[in-house]
């Protein structure tokens, strides 16, 4: 195909005719007005928003979960330390109460002390808690020796022990009055692991030592994270020692970290009761993998509870969430890049190629290649521009041929002037047609340029007019370009709908977070149930108080009956003395009434037998009073274990103990008086036997003696009735005491259950509330990012209701 020459004359396009094409070229070369640049910038902004939002969400979620894990490990360490402290405090309270018992007081023998420690262990509700009980005399031997006066260990009774085998010996000389000292854990000769608690006995000379078993204490350590193990360490300035461990007994007694002192292990040196967390414990130097740890001190002891958890287990959930979120971000980024790269890059490349071809045609290079292998609207646009180029070249060639013919006709002979003139006219007509076509093409190109400029500015609703031109090539170009714009507009609408879907999903996530917060209210109901359990515990304590009041009344009845027995016994003694005097007066006058005297002697012997029976009953009362005293001691011990909730019960138990001691003393008085009556009765019998040899007394004196001893018999019957009343009252006392002990056990169990449930529910409610608040914040942030994406897409003006047919114009 030939290229028009520069001297083509008026048939070649003028410089002013190319102005619209120059404008199109200038617009295409402006980066800020380029569709490719805008599309790339929009994709870049979307990528940045998705990446930044995703990274922020995963960082925030990971930090929240890791903080919850750290708090959980700290709370478990504090809970274990509190459990150990409570265990020590219960033991020390029990030892303090037992050491002040009068049976360890002044003027008590070794046998009395031995009987007391035996009964102390027998009365213990949980016998496995106590390994051995000793009463030691620290004043015998050297500073590191002591003599065991009484013990539940038969082999240890009466032996002298040293601190080498019994570590508590070193502490016996430094204990103050009404104080309790506990040792570090150690192993007894029998292999049991124990902790000794000791206090000065009531006689201020001996020391009561109770060895509590501590072997199963480590079994109660909590482990909420897989692979967690707990150790209780005693740090010193020289070295460290593991006192308890739930990771096996091999570590017990060994250094926490070999060749390290307290100051060389910062976590142990700075541990407090509130608990601390560290990601890099010093213990890692001797472990086979990475661990995190929480430290806290045991209240009142120089012991540190160290809870270790494997790092991969402690932060497993946060690592999974981090991986999931990063994977989601990667998929989203790859999807956006693929969509943008596929649609935007190919479309932009085709538009740039088409723009370059149009610029070449504008410059007069009609041989430029405008072919395309695409079969879509872009390919049709290439074909339309190619057809337009071919039509324009054909018209230019025709104009050139007409001009050449006119020139040849002018050079012909004058004879053919008319034909040449006609040819000139035809040439002028052809020129006029060509100029009209050029003007039409210029106007159409200007309109097309305006539409392209608007589209470059983001207005995808504009369309090229295809119906106001008679040129089929220009109409085909407009139709193809309009169809391409319709596809672009549809793509932008799809992206906007995607942004709307993200915003809608964010709102649904906010609703889900609200539902989770309402679920927290159910946790509050669980706390109310715990409060109900506490009320039930209080009601049971009121019942125990009433039962102990009944027990006190029964003891008072025992005392009243004992007074009645004492009064009747006194009257019996007076009557017996009257009978004795009467018998002495009748000795000289009653020789004739020997048979009557024999009958009197038999009555006195019967009275002696009845007095023996009364003595047995009084012994029974003494035994019951002693048992009541031991029950009161046990009640004191249980009240000490119940902490503050058992204060009222302890007061009642003390009153029961005092009444039992008074009853025992009254029974002793009765027994002594009965002994005196029996002695007097024996003397009366002897005197009556002697009276058989000199019965010179008168009949009247003998009758007085019979009457006196008849009165003695009557009073003896009354004494028996009083003793029976004492027996009945004592039975009531025993029943009330048993019921009080049963209720005390139920109250202790309910108290433990209430404390455990309250602690668990409180921790769960706090953690859930914190997590729901943080998740709600993250969802709100994601919703805001979706709104930002919608704002960026709103820069493109589209019509969602438009049909994507290429015939619509704007």
Curated annotation (Swiss-Prot):
Its main location: membrane. Residues 414-427 have a biased composition (Basic and acidic residues). It comes from the Archaea. Gene3D superfamilies: 6.10.250.1910, Methyl-accepting chemotaxis protein (1.10.287.950). GO terms for biological process: chemotaxis; signal transduction. Methylated by CheR. It is a multi-pass membrane protein. Residues 755-774 have a biased composition (Low complexity). Residues 1-38, 345-810 are cytoplasmic. InterPro entries: HAMP_dom (IPR003660), MCPsignal_dom (IPR004089). Pfam families: HAMP, MCPsignal. One of its GO terms (cellular component) is plasma membrane. The modification Glutamate methyl ester (Glu) is found at residues 556, 739. Residues 403-427, 751-784 are annotated as: Disordered. The chain crosses the membrane at residues 39-59, 324-344. Residues 512-748 form the Methyl-accepting transducer domain. Keywords: Cell membrane, Chemotaxis, Membrane, Methylation, Repeat, Transducer, Transmembrane, Transmembrane helix. PROSITE patterns: CHEMOTAXIS_TRANSDUC_2, HAMP. It is found in: Cell membrane. Residues 345-397, 439-493 form the HAMP domain. Mediates chemotaxis towards compatible osmolytes. Probably transduces the signal from the substrate-binding protein CosB to the histidine kinase CheA. This is Transducer protein CosT. It comes from Halobacterium salinarum (strain ATCC 700922 / JCM 11081 / NRC-1).
């Amino acid at each position: 195909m030939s290229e028009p020459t520069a001297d083509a004359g008026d048939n070649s396009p003028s410089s002013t005719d190319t102005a619209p094409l120059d404008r199109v070229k200038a617009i295409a070369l402006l980066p800020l007005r380029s569709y490719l640049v805008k599309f790339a910038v929009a994709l870049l902004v979307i990528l940045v928003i998705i990446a930044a939002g995703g990274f922020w969400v995963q960082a925030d979620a990971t930090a929240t979960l890791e903080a919850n894990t750290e708090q959980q490990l700290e709370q478990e360490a504090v809970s274990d330390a509190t459990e150990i402290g409570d265990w020590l405090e219960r033991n020390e309270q029990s030892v303090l109460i037992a050491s002040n018992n009068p049976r360890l007081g002044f003027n008590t023998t070794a046998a009395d002390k031995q009987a007391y420690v035996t009964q102390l262990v027998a009365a213990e509700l949980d016998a496995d808690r106590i390994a051995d009980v000793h009463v030691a005399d620290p004043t015998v031997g050297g500073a590191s020796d002591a003599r065991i006066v009484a013990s539940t260990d038969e082999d240890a009774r009466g032996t002298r022990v040293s601190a080498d085998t019994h570590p508590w010996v070193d502490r016996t000389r430094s204990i103050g009055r009404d104080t309790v000292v506990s040792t570090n854990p150690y192993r007894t000769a029998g292999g049991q692991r124990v902790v000794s608690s000791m206090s000065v006995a009531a006689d201020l000379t001996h020391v009561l030592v109770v060895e509590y078993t501590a072997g199963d204490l480590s079994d109660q350590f909590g482990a909420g994270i897989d692979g967690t193990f707990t150790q209780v360490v005693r740090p010193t300035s020289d070295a460290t020692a593991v006192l308890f461990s739930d990771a096996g007994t091999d570590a017990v007694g060994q250094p926490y970290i070999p060749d390290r002192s307290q100051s060389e292990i910062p976590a142990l040196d700075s541990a407090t009761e509130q608990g601390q967390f560290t990601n890099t414990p010093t213990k890692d130097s001797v472990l086979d993998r990475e661990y995190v740890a929480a430290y806290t001190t045991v209240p009142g002891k120089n012991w540190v509870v160290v809870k270790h958890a494997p790092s991969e287990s402690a932060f497993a959930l946060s690592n999974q969430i981090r991986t999931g979120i990063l994977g989601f971000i990667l998929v989203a980024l790859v999807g956006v890049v693929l969509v943008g790269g596929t649609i935007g890059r190919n479309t932009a490349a085709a538009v740039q190629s088409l723009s370059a071809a149009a610029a070449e045609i504008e410059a007069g290079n009609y041989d430029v290649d405008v072919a395309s292998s695409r079969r879509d609207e872009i390919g049709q646009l290439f074909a339309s521009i190619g057809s337009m180029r071919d039509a324009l070249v054909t018209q230019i060639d025709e104009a050139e041929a007409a001009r050449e013919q006119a020139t040849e006709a002018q050079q012909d002979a004058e004879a053919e002037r008319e034909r040449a003139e006609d040819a000139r006219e035809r040439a002028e007509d052809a020129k006029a047609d060509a100029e009209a076509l050029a003007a039409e093409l210029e106007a159409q190109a200007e309109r097309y340029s305006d539409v392209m400029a608007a589209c470059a500015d983001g207005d995808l609703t504009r369309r090229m007019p295809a119906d106001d031109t008679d040129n089929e090539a220009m109409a085909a170009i407009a139709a193809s370009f309009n169809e391409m714009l319709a596809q672009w507009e549809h793509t932008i609408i799809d992206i906007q709908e995607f942004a709307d879907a993200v915003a809608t999903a964010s709102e649904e996530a906010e609703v889900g977070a609200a539902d989770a917060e309402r679920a927290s209210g159910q946790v509050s109901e669980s706390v109310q149930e715990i409060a109900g359990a506490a009320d039930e515990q209080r009601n049971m304590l009121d019942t125990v108080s009433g039962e102990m009041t009944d027990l006190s009344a029964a003891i008072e009845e025992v005392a009243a009956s004992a007074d009645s027995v004492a009064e009747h016994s006194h009257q019996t003694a007076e009557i017996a003395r009257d009978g004795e005097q009467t018998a002495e007066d009748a000795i000289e006058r009653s020789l004739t009434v020997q048979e009557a005297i024999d009958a009197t002697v038999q009555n006195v012997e019967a009275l002696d037998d009845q007095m023996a029976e009364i003595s047995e009953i009084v012994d029974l009362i003494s035994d019951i009073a002693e048992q009541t005293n031991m029950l009161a001691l046990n009640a004191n011990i249980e009240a000490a274990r119940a902490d503050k909730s058992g204060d009222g019960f302890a007061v009642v138990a003390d009153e029961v103990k005092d009444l039992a001691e008074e009853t025992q003393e009254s029974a002793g008085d009765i027994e002594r008086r009965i002994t005196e009556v029996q002695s007097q009765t024996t003397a009366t019998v002897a005197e009556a036997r002697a009276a058989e040899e000199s019965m010179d007394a008168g009949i009247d004196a003998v009758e007085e003696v019979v009457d006196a001893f008849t009165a003695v018999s009557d009073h003896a019957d009354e004494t028996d009735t009083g003793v029976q009343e004492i027996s009945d009252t004592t039975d009531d006392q025993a029943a009330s005491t048993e019921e009080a002990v049963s209720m005390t056990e139920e109250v202790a169990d309910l108290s433990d259950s209430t404390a455990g449930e309250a602690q668990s529910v409180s921790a769960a409610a706090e953690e859930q509330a914190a997590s729901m608040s943080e998740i709600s914040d993250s969802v709100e942030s994601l919703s805001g990012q979706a709104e930002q994406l919608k704002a960026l897409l709103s820069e493109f003006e589209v019509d969602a209701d438009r049909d994507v047919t290429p015939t619509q114009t704007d």
